[in-house]
Swiss-Prot record:
Residues 58-109, 150-161, 254-267 have a biased composition (Low complexity). Residues 26-57, 110-128, 135-149, 163-176, 186-228, 235-253 have a biased composition (Polar residues). It comes from Rattus norvegicus. Residues 25-386 are extracellular. Monomer; when associated with the membrane raft. Oligomer; when integrated in the apical membrane. Interacts with NHERF2. Interacts (via the C-terminal PDZ-binding motif DTHL) with NHERF1 (via the PDZ domains); the interaction take place early in the secretory pathway and is necessary for its apical membrane sorting. Found in a complex with EZR, PODXL and NHERF2. Associates with the actin cytoskeleton through complex formation with EZR and NHERF2. Keywords: Cell adhesion, Cell membrane, Cell projection, Glycoprotein, Membrane, Phosphoprotein, Signal, Transmembrane, Transmembrane helix. This is Podocalyxin. Glomerular epithelium cell (podocyte) (at protein level). The modification Phosphoserine is found at S464. The lineage of its organism: Eukaryota, Metazoa, Chordata, Craniata, Vertebrata.
Length: 485
């Protein structure tokens, strides 16, 4: 009986001794060893409002070899530069018993994953593609470790194909993940393996980012801004998008003749030969007897002169310049006349004379004055009083002619009246018998006192005794005078 009692006492003691660490281990699993991962996304707060100073750890934890496997089942997973991750882990407790503990894990998609404490359990956690500031705190009984990362946006690489990746510019943290589930041998501790970037305040030009996809790796280099200044977000296409855009791009090879254009200048003529072209209906094509035109040899000046004269009949090489643009025809001894430009060099004097003829049109167009040296507009050069002066002169001449005509008429009438009055007075004096000089009076009127018979044409004497003075002879006159005396 004694050995039996002693053996039972030893067994009870061993059971008590074994039950005490198991209880403490269970409590540790519930409090210390349980890993709780909560992801809280805040889309309203900007990244610059988060703290940017780092607090060093107050305690040193022994390294625990832990492998993490993450997968992104949601292809439309969004990124948030303001998301915060809080991780509680126990780095000192190792599971030695087969007790089971349930660890609630909250992912970005809102799913809760329960993991057991056995060695055969598998934990799969959906990670967001962009990690924000991470606050990791371990809560053992005597240790208090708090780590705060800078609030600058972080950049990571994910192994989720067919998923566009967007990241924020700034300092970066690289997280390598693969889509596989990992089982822990003795514990269910979850750790975030983070590579902290440079301290706040440092700036770089470009930071290479490695984007890992199954089978294809594409390096992407993005410029970084200083941490102090707020940086926007930039969309970085994945390797699949890069491959698609590269395959759709094809280089454009310029097709057509590669003959370089050449230019010749000779005096007032300028010829430009363009590359050879194909003939069509809208081109003026000239067939040539020689194929040396626009083939490197100088052009025929006579040919150019004819073309320029056809464009302008009054073309003068001394005053005008002619520019021609020709192009040879492919597989043919012909050229196409593409353009003929005649440039006329006019002197300022010639332009002034042309504008003077159109001064009224220029005035309507808004031109007020024009001058060339001392010459001005046509109205300034002309006498404004010339027309009224001419009219005045013509009127005065007409008036003078009219006055002269009136004076001549009046003077003639007056002279005629005087003659008639004198004759009337003489006749009245003769009739009254008053003779100042009787001899003169008798001599003046001999025909009145002469009496002679008039002989008719037949020789007969007429009854008339008055004979005209012209028919009297000198002898008759003498006889009359003697008789009168």
């Amino acid at each position: 009986m004694r050995p039996t009692l002693a053996l039972s006492a030893l067994l009870l003691l061993q059971l008590l001794l074994l039950s005490t660490p198991s209880l403490s281990q269970d409590n540790g699993n519930k409090t210390d060893t349980s890993d709780i991962t909560s992801i809280d996304q805040n889309q309203d707060k900007p990244a610059t409002n988060q703290p940017s100073n780092a607090t060093p750890k107050s305690s040193v934890q022994p390294p625990t070899p832990t492998s993490i496997s993450t997968s992104s089942p949601d292809p439309k997973a969004t990124q948030s530069s303001n998301s915060s991750v809080t991780t509680t882990s126990d780095s000192t407790t190792d599971r030695t018993s087969s007790s089971t503990s349930t660890v609630p894990t909250t992912s970005n998609s809102g799913q809760t994953v329960s993991s057991g404490g056995k060695s055969s359990d598998k934990i799969t956690t959906a990670l967001p593609t962009t990690l924000g500031p991470v606050n990791a705190s371990s809560q053992p009984t005597d240790l208090n470790t708090s780590t705060k990362l800078p609030s600058t946006p972080t950049t990571n690489s994910t192994a989720s194909p067919h998923q566009p990746v967007s990241h924020s510019e700034g300092q970066h943290t690289t997280v390598q993940s693969s889509s596989a589930s990992v089982s822990s041998s003795d514990n269910t501790t979850l750790l975030w393996i983070l590579t902290t970037s440079k301290p706040t305040g440092t700036s770089e030009g470009t930071q290479p980012i490695a984007i890992s996809t199954p089978g294809i790796t594409t390096p992407v280099s993005t410029p970084l801004q200083p941490t102090g200044s707020p940086g926007g977000t930039e969309s970085v296409p994945t390797t699949e998008e890069f491959t698609h855009s590269t395959s759709s791009w094809t280089p454009v090879v310029s097709q057509g003749p590669s003959t370089p254009s050449s230019t010749w200048t000779s005096g007032s003529y300028k010829l430009k030969c363009d590359p050879a072209i194909k003939p069509h209906e809208e081109l003026l094509i000239l067939n040539l007897t020689r194929d040396s035109f626009c083939k490197g040899s100088p052009p025929n000046e006579r040919f150019l002169e004819l073309l320029c004269h056809s464009a302008k009949a009054s073309f003068k090489p001394a005053e005008d310049s002619c520019a021609l643009e020709l192009a040879p025809i492919l597989d043919n001894q012909a050229v196409a006349v593409k353009r003929i430009v005649i440039e006329t060099k006019l002197s300022p004097k010639a332009v002034f004379e042309l504008l003077k003829d159109k001064w009224d049109d220029l005035t309507e167009a808004g031109v007020i004055d024009i001058h060339l040296g001392k010459e001005g507009p046509p109205e300034v050069n002309e006498d404004r009083f010339s027309l009224p002066l001419i009219i005045t002169i013509v009127c005065m001449a007409s008036f003078l002619l009219l006055v002269a005509a009136l004076y001549g008429c009046c003077h003639q009438r007056i002279s005629q009246r005087k003659d008639q009055q004198r004759l009337t007075e003489e006749l009245q004096t003769v009739e009254n018998g008053y003779h100042d000089n009787p001899t003169l009076e008798v001599m003046e009127t001999p025909s009145e006192m002469q009496e002679k018979k008039v002989v008719n044409l037949n020789g007969e004497l007429g009854d008339s005794w008055i004979v005209p003075l012209d028919n009297l002879t000198k002898e008759d006159l003498d006889e009359e005078e003697d008789t009168h005396l």
